[in-house]
Amino acid sequence: MGCLDVRFCRIIFALYSLIRKYGAWLVIPAMLGGAAFLADSVLTPAVSISSAVEGLKTLPALEHLFTENKDLTMMITAVIIVILFAVQSRGTESIGKVFGSVVMVWFAFLAIVGVVAIGNDWSVLAALNPYYGIKFLFSPNNATGLALMGTVFLSTTGAEALYSDMGHVGRGNIYFTWPFIKVALVLNYFGQGAWMLHNQNNPELADAEGINPFFQMMDPNVRYVAVVLSVTAGIIASQALITGAFTMVSEATGLNWMPHLQVCYPARTRGQLYIPVVNVVLCVATLAVLLLFRDSEHISAAYGLALTITMITTTILLGIYLWHRSNKFGAVVFTIVFLAIQVLFFAASMAKFLHGGWFTLLLTLAILMIMYTWNEGTKLERSQRRHMMPKDFLPALDKLHGDSRIHRFADNIVYLTSDPDLKRLDTDIFFSIFADHPKRARAWWAVAVETTDEPFTREYSVESFGTDYLFRVRIRLGFKVSQSIPAYLHQIMHDLEKTGELPNQQSIYPKLDADPGIGTIRYVVIHKALMPESKVSGRGALSLQIKYAIRRVAGSPVKWFGLAPYNPLVEVQPLFVSTRRPPRLTRVASQAPKREG
């Protein structure tokens, strides 16, 4: 799939962005798949690192330590997880350069120890014939029934990690190395199978607890190397999912499915990003999973379900894409074949619902609720958005600008807007200027900020509508450039003052940090809110209330754009409020209060 040649890996959302014009219902599998992927990003660090750390139990020199302290592996895993999330803010570009070499060594090691262990029982190679697998699935000896497929599915996990971190490794490298990885994994599984066949009647292992064929099939001295490599590989796999989660949330924000969050770019490319809030949430959630399930065996029960949901939704979206972009018959065959396999795995994974699958579904539904309510709330807000053309707002603003009876609110009043069109004005801004006491100023500014795909873009456009008191500004900033708006706006005002487009505004109360010729500046941020008299459906009201609750946690433009030190005015404008006059009151004669007794 390779992210379908989208410049930066957008995983499942790339498919949705390409096909959403074919049906509104496609938002359902896209959101569900994205939510499941983010749930997987919580489970992967917990299961991959804990399973690797558990290899320490098989080392003869350390065996007694883990026998005496059952929670030691969990504590070691927790420390590694905390360190992993703590270094995210520094970026992984430098250590990412060695990821490829480490992974190559890891899979080469898997292949070698697998080949050595196959010598225990060469009959294991008969598993190359799928007949034996199908025969055992329906055999009376298979006590677990269809649930066996849930265990089989875990052997495929990790595939999503290979493409979730395109920002580090690139699509071409993944395509080139996939055959090598496939062969290495199969050889290793054959080695584990051969060891189990060889030791099925071993009395020393009959009553042993927590047998791990992967480590047990190796010579005790080799296990030390295996533990180091497996922990390193687990960290790399976790890193891939963490980076993938950052990308997923960033793209969900672009689709208006999640709130605007502070995004940092510690590396030189936009494909490698860091979102502080998401990092903290992932870390806390991963530690919670570790504390709840305590070991990799129990975590794996919850692990597979998220992957099957992601795979099913991706297949549906890709099938729709192929239907509209290529051979329709091929698209149908592809979709049916892959869905048949994936639905089988999903049903098998649901057999583990009570053993951990419930947690995966709960986590997925929680993330899905955030996406759905934010999307619905945004659509409701946009349905109320109106714009005015110059002929509608210029006469009133011109009159207010010259009305000396009204004291100036500030020399410059700056509004932030999400509308990049410089030829019109948000009605909300117009209402804010004239509501109650009109906000008279020497100049009004409506500023929109866009983030570009280039790292260091710094440019702006201005529309003044032929006036010297109203300016629509569009600022375009590269993704690595600070978005502190006040500094840029001071420069823009100074530039316009130099060209004569903005009259000199020398304030009688000069500020220490003011540019020459620039007066006082007041920032206004408009928030939408529901009022008791808002006419909106119950479902719509719930979506908006949840969205605003999330917004309070996620932050606001005051923080994103560096406005906090400038004491911005935050105004609330009601949604879905009728403009009709309320019913008139009837005046009645006053009555004297009755005396008691």
Curated annotation (Swiss-Prot):
The UniProt catalytic activity note for this protein reads: K(+)(in) + H(+)(in) = K(+)(out) + H(+)(out)
GO cellular-component term (any): plasma membrane
Top-level division of the source organism's lineage: Bacteria
MF terms per GO, please? potassium ion transmembrane transporter activity; symporter activity
Residue ranges of the TM segments: 23-43, 72-92, 98-118, 143-163, 174-194, 226-246, 273-293, 303-323, 329-349, 353-373
Q: Name one Pfam family in it.
A: K_trans_C
Say which family it is in: Belongs to the HAK/KUP transporter (TC 2.A.72) family.
Q: What does this protein do?
A: Transport of potassium into the cell. Likely operates as a K(+):H(+) symporter.
Q: What's the protein name? A: Probable potassium transport system protein Kup 1
Q: Which gene encodes it?
A: kup1
